[in-house]
Amino acid sequence: MPLGSEERRLLRLIAFLNKNNPYPPVEGTARQRRRARRRWRQAQEQLRALAERIWHSRVEEQLVQAIDQLVLDQQHLAIQQLPDPPSSS
């Protein structure tokens, strides 16, 4: 499925968010490194949740638009009145 301009923009936004949270440096005591990794993991979890919300909101919008289009298409359909079947006598 080719990506549209809106999807590319969302992916660039998500990539930008991930780029701004680099892995912590290997400096400091073991406790400092452990705390830095813990804070980094927490930030990564928040970024993943945010990215998921951003992406799924777009998917939900597309789904709502598709459903609306189906409803409009169905409104144009008309049921034809069929004649009564012949009776066998």
From Swiss-Prot:
GO molecular function, one term: RNA binding
Homomultimerization: region residues: 13-21
GO annotation, biological process: mRNA transport
Gene name for this UniProt entry: rev
UniProt subunit comment: Homomultimer; when bound to the RRE. Multimeric assembly is essential for activity.
Record motif Nuclear localization signal and RNA-binding (RRE), residues: 29-45
Protein keywords: Host cytoplasm, Host nucleus, mRNA transport, RNA-binding, Transport
Cellular compartments annotated: Host nucleus, Host nucleolus; Host cytoplasm
Residue ranges annotated as motif Nuclear export signal: 70-82
UniProt free text on domains: The RNA-binding motif binds to the RRE, a stem-and-loop structure present in incompletely spliced viral pre-mRNAs. This region also contains the NLS which mediates nuclear localization. These overlapping functions prevent Rev bound to RRE from undesirable return to the nucleus. When Rev binds the RRE, the NLS becomes masked while the NES remains accessible.
Protein name (database record): Protein Rev
Gene3D superfamilies, per the entry: 6.10.140.630
Originating species: Simian immunodeficiency virus agm.vervet (isolate AGM3) (SIV-agm.ver)
GO CC annotation, single: host cell nucleolus
Function per UniProt: Escorts unspliced or incompletely spliced viral pre-mRNAs (late transcripts) out of the nucleus of infected cells. These pre-mRNAs carry a recognition sequence called Rev responsive element (RRE) located in the env gene, that is not present in fully spliced viral mRNAs (early transcripts). This function is essential since most viral proteins are translated from unspliced or partially spliced pre-mRNAs which cannot exit the nucleus by the pathway used by fully processed cellular mRNAs.
Main location: host cell
Pfam families in UniProt: REV
